[in-house]
Structure formats: C-alpha cells, structure tokens
Amino acid sequence: MYSNSKSRKNHLFIVLVLSSLLLSSALIINNSHHSDTNVVYGQKNTTQQHINPPTNTNPNLINLQDIPLEKVRVGDIDIAYKMFGKGDPIILFNGASDGLDAWDPALLMVISSNHTVIAFDQRGIGNSTVGSQPYTHQQLANDTSGLLDAINISKANVVGLSLGSYLAQQFTIMYPDKVNSLTLVGSSCGGKDHTPKPAEFIKLQSDIVNKSLNNVPLSTDELRELIAASLGSGWVNLHPESVDVPANITSLQQLKPGLPPEVADSQNKVGKYWEDNPLWSGTCDELGKLDKPTLVITGTDDIKYQPYINSFKIVEKVPGAWLIQIKNAGHAVMDQYPEGVGIILNTFLSTIK
C-alpha cells in the first residue's frame, strides 16, 4: 500500500461521527447483515467536521524514529520490532511492502495512549532478515507467534491492514489462544468468497512488480494510477495534488527502499494465493467459529485494491462483528484518517471484557 505522507498531513478531516460513533452503535443496524452485528456508517456530508491536521510539533505524536529498534531471533530469521505505550498489547500487521516505520504517528499516538503497541518488520522487510523458509501465510503467522513468545507477550489484540489483514486472520486461526481481538482493515477472507480486483488493476500491479524485478523504469502514469487506486476517487477529487509524483521517481525501490524486489514478488504471490484460489474455502467460516471480538474497517472508495464488498462478506460470516465504513477513503484509510481510525479502534477495544 502506498502511504502519501504529504496528503495525510496537509489535508486531514474526519467524519464527526467517528469520534462518538460507538455511543449509539448498538442502535445502528443494517438489516442486510447479521441482526447481532453493529454496523456504523460515517457518510453524511452534514456531519463532517474539519479538524486541524497533526504536525510533528505536537509533542504527543509518536515518531517511531525516536523509539529504539530491537531485534530477536525467531526460527531462521531476525525480527526487528519496536514496542511502546502501556496497557493491553496491540500487535500491528503491516500492509504489503510496508515496514514498521510506515504507521502514521497520529494513529500511534491515539492507540498507544492506553495500549502497549508492537510494530514489527515482517520477514524480508526493512530490518528483518528473509531467512530460508518458504514465504507463506502459515510461515509468517509462525514468525509472529515466535516474536510474541520472545518478548513475553502471551495474548494481544491483533490489527492487520491489507495483506497484513490476511496474515492477521491466519495468525488468529493458527494461534487463537494468543488473540484477544481481531481488527481487519481493507480485508478479505479470501478463497471462494472473495470478490476480485478489477482485471486491469491486477495487471497493473503485476506489471509494476515485474518491472521492479527486471530494473525497468516505471512511468509517471503507472505510479499515479497506483497511488490513486490506494487513495480512492473521493479523496483524489478533494485533494488532486495527492497523486503528484516527482519526476525523478521511476521505481518501486525509490518509494519503498526497505523492500527487496524478490520479497515484493513473494508478497504478491501470497496475496494472489489468498485472493485467486477458488478451490480454497477461505477463512470466513473458520473465523466465525472462533468467537473473537472482530472489527472490520473499509473505505467507501476502496474498489481497486480491495473491493469493499469483501469487508461486508467478513461481517456476514462472523457473528457480532462490527463494520465501519468511512466516506471518501480508499485502501489507504489508515493513512487518510489516522486519528479517526485510532479512535474507532480504542473505543472498540474498550468494549471487550
């Protein structure tokens, strides 16, 4: 997922109901889903409130650069992580291509106010080594379990974004005793229930990865299209400058210097297996049996990266799951509305006994 720091810092507003949405969430029901599902929408233009964007001069913002990087040996790899805050643990599963430093400081400020937050580099990303084991959902879940064991965390609230949400689901299924709750952002339960991305966007992603593997320069149009797909049409219409690409940026490596092309290819294959395997039943049925408090967040404009209908399918299959859909947000919803997402997450977690 592409994180456009300029757009999220200079142009930040959230829907008013996000700050108080759970005061009445039990009363807001969408009858197309389970009757015991809490469904909250923040879509009415009349409820919008402009909020001053966070800046790095705010002493409460969490700058991960200021937090010491630690490493532990887990199996065949060294895992890099940072841990901060105080309270019940939250472990963050990054989106594809992102390292631990990609999380927005405003989001981290909110959630670390009453939780211990664990951000880490997945296998082969950033400061974590790639190892020799096959790059699979199962192996990445095993890595995470080993990390929690190494830092003496017995149970955590699991939060996953995009590809990280797939890994969060896999981890929850394989290690349910280590999971207190599950939050999925821009997600799908995969397999037979998955609604695919548009074919032209699948081709764009594959072309970009293949060009990166072969050191072929990317065009400005390709990069702009990739960014626009992540942000969604509503955000781009409001902030057209958010898709501007400097002329000297011609490769994925320049955007993601901590991402080796081979790992990008492995992550792409992991994602494709999850999304493009109709013979696999997916995870929805298994998640529904685990009885874990579940929060699902999606943007109204997440159409290309992860069609938002996939979030609806998770909620339909997981009894009691909460659905939050944020207006004018795309797949990059955690970058576009970091404080709002943090408030949602904190409030959801406060309801868990």
Please name every model-derived segment.
Residues L182-S219:
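Flexible "cap/lid" loop of the alpha/beta hydrolase fold
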Residues I303-N310:
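Conserved alpha/beta-hydrolase "acid-adjacent" motif
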Residues L290, V296-T298:
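Short beta-strand/loop motif that positions the catalytic acidic residue
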Residues P319-K353:
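Catalytic active-site module of serine/aspartate enzymes centered on a nucleophile-bearing elbow/loop
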Residues T220-S281, D285-E286:
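Conserved alpha/beta-hydrolase catalytic His-Asp/Glu region
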Residues V74-T129:
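Conserved HGGG/HGGXW glycine-rich cap/lid loop of the alpha/beta-hydrolase fold
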Residues S154-P196:
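Conserved hydrolase catalytic core segment
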Residues A119-V159, L163:
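Active-site loop/oxyanion-hole signature of alpha/beta-hydrolase fold enzymes
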